């Protein structure tokens, strides 16, 4: 895989300029569906930190789009390049994510990332940032709200309400599992608002998280221990 350009071209390392870059990159986000009508491959990504935050670990899982079984799993580790700054997490996570993407043997048709898409104060969470840099269709799946407000969705699986910021919709609050807090679902790049919701519902099984980010989360939390692949014993978790 190759990216469409430098990750942080022109950034001097300051918070103010990072916020300005976010606003500029947000203008390049495409919010219409460009996902293949018959996608073959999905990917899930999640990021964690090791060694007291000195090392950034990105987990990547490539899945069959029809069975949702994993075909490849990879973990990339890079030195953490900046401290945690609220609203600028993508600058911290993106280098490791790009390394993990490069480990995949095939290009995914659609990417799910554990984090925000455009449901972000400057409309550029990690899934949007990753999408603009790589050109890949992306969806952000977050466990908590970062921006905007929403009415609590109904109690049943699939119930959803729009997340609004400044009068505009930036995502969905989705009840992916009864008696669980809603997920924050938002398009990242080359996916519409309805497309982000539809693909998330399509990739849910009996868990709170959709399969791509659920498997990536498992891999990331195991510090590199791999789940079974589709060619091996079927997954039973």
From Swiss-Prot:
Record-level GO cellular component terms? cytoplasm
Q: Does the keyword DNA repair apply?
A: yes
Instruction: Tell me the cofactors it needs.
Output: Mg(2+)
Q: Does the keyword DNA repair apply?
A: yes
Compartments, record wording: Cytoplasm
Which Pfam families does the record cross-reference, listed alphabetically? Endonuclease_5
The record's keywords, sorted A to Z, are: Cytoplasm, DNA damage, DNA repair, Endonuclease, Hydrolase, Magnesium, Metal-binding, Nuclease
GO biological process, alphabetically ordered: DNA repair
Cross-referenced InterPro entries, in alphabetical order? Endonuclease-V
- NCBIfam families this protein is in? PRK11617.1
Q: What does this protein do?
A: DNA repair enzyme involved in the repair of deaminated bases. Selectively cleaves double-stranded DNA at the second phosphodiester bond 3' to a deoxyinosine leaving behind the intact lesion on the nicked DNA.
What the record says about family reads: Belongs to the endonuclease V family.
Identify this protein by name: Endonuclease V
Q: What is the lineage of its organism?
A: Bacteria, Pseudomonadati, Pseudomonadota, Gammaproteobacteria, Lysobacterales
Q: Which gene encodes it?
A: nfi
């Amino acid at each position: 895989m190759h990216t469409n350009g430098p990750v942080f071209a022109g950034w001097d390392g300051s918070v103010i300029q990072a916020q300005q870059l976010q606003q500029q990159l947000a203008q390049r986000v495409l919010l219409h569906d460009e996902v293949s009508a018959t996608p073959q491959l999905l990917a899930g990504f999640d990021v964690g930190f090791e060694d007291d935050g000195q090392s950034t670990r990105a987990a990547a899982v490539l899945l069959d789009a029809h069975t949702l079984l994993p075909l490849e799993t990879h973990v990339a580790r890079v030195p953490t390049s900046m401290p945690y700054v609220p609203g600028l997490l993508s600058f911290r996570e993106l280098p490791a994510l790009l390394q993990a993407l490069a480990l995949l043997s095939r290009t995914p048709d659609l990417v799910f990332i554990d984090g925000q898409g455009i449901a972000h104060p400057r409309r550029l969470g990690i899934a949007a940032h990753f999408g603009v840099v790589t050109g890949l269709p992306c969806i952000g799946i977050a466990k908590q709200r970062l921006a905007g407000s929403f009415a609590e969705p109904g109690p049943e699986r699939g119930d959803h309400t729009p997340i609004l910021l400044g009068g505009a919709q930036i995502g969905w609050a989705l009840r992916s599992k009864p008696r669980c807090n809603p997920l924050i679902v938002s398009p990242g790049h080359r996916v519409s608002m309805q497309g982000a919701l539809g693909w998330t519902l399509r990739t849910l099984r009996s868990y709170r998280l959709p399969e791509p980010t659920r498997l990536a989360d498992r891999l990331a939390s195991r510090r590199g221990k791999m789940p079974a692949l589709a060619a091996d014993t079927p997954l039973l978790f």
